[in-house]
Amino acid sequence: MCNKIKEYWEKFCCENKIPNDTKYEAWSFGNTKEMADELADLVNKGIKTATTGAYELYDEDEEIPKVGEYNIILDGSGEPICITITRDVYIINYNLISSDHAFREGEGDRSYEYWKKVHDKFFSEEYRKSNKEFKEDAPMVCELFEKIY
């Protein structure tokens, strides 16, 4: 793991009296540098407080997020931008995701229509890369989080 990320985590732990060995994940959003930069900025500004992942595209040994987990959000260059804590996680079919969840994702005009348009494109591409077909009723992992640092 990058020393910058480790140092960022240790600084957070020291300032918040959290043991350094507390588990965390460091990751970026999306599938391009530009998307990672844009979405990390939305999280850092407190606008983006939710995300959606395709359950069927998780690696076999990859766990879904858990309530109480810490995440270091990285930009498109792998630089730490902020830290979040997971507040809720649920699995729901893509076509049943609510306008409230879409709003919390913080993207575009925050409407469900905008969210669906960009996520249809994103998930279609991600499924295609995995040689799978994206379907409207695909199970999705919805995560709500709070920026804490």
Show where each model-derived region lies.
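Mixed-charge, low-complexity intrinsically disordered regions
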Residues: 1-83, 89-149
